[in-house]
Amino acid sequence: MITKNYLIDKIHDKLNCLSKEDVKDSVDLILDYLNESLKKQKRIEIRNFGNFSIRKRKFPESEKFYNTVYYRMPKNLFKE
């Protein structure tokens, strides 16, 4: 499983020119922006990674709806 801290460590290892705090701030900024975009019902498209969007789902045996995040991966994600 990839956690936020794992991601920060890997990016920091790859980019030695940035401090770990700078990498953490950058990752936090990106994740906050993605989170806010989904809250505003915006579709997020990251080429060669996938699309994120909000879908409405109906509760079973109820007339109420809820929002859920939908992910669609690209066809070439696992191709070499």
UniProtKB/Swiss-Prot annotation:
Record keywords: DNA condensation, DNA-binding
GO molecular function: DNA binding; structural constituent of chromatin
InterPro entries, A to Z: Hist_DNA-bd, IHF-like_DNA-bd_dom_sf
GO annotation, biological process: chromosome condensation
Organism taxonomic ancestry: Bacteria, Pseudomonadati, Pseudomonadota, Alphaproteobacteria, Rickettsiales
The species this protein was found in: Rickettsia conorii (strain ATCC VR-613 / Malish 7)
Name of the protein described by the UniProt record: DNA-binding protein HU-like
Function: Histone-like DNA-binding protein which is capable of wrapping DNA to stabilize it, and thus to prevent its denaturation under extreme environmental conditions.
Pfam families with a match to the protein in the record: Bac_DNA_binding
Family according to the record: Belongs to the bacterial histone-like protein family.
PANTHER family with a match to the protein in the record: DNA-BINDING PROTEIN HU, DNA-BINDING PROTEIN HU-BETA
Any single Gene Ontology cellular-component annotation: cytosol
